[in-house]
């Protein structure tokens, strides 16, 4: 038999983002005369948090001359506001969004169980059976408060802010 445990804690590229992966594997083999039985169980969990500072692509669209802070050192919500032919274009500050308390993360959990039986009928003749069962759970959680810059052009106060929570599960059997 064997037992393996692994963990990987990785900071993301953007400030405040991270990925955490945990896993464990248990393997066992039993042999008696003409019968061999193998069993394994694998458990894997993954959690990630997206950066409250926005995505890298948001920063690539900003001009270097925008000033993200006011005279008091406080982050401003809007960096630039243009109206062309009646259409408003707002350039928002992703640094501001980090101060309003957003939540944006995902998680998953997977369990896989394998069972293999082998029986030697004759020296060159054997019967095998393999069973596998997998169960998985996944979810995400995203909260943007009403003061988040993505709602800057929204005038209706009842449409500002959002919360999205999703979850899913799967299971599968296979046999050979």
Go through each PLM region and give its residues.
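Short strand-turn segments of transmembrane beta-barrel domains in outer membranes
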Residues: 1-17
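Residue-level signature of outer-membrane beta-barrel architecture
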Residues: 1, 7, 28-32, 117-119
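Surface-exposed loop/interface segments of Gram-negative outer-membrane beta-barrel transport/assembly proteins
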Residues: 12-14, 23-112, 128-130, 134-176
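Short, solvent-exposed loop/turn segments in extracellular or other extracytoplasmic domains
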Residues: 19-21
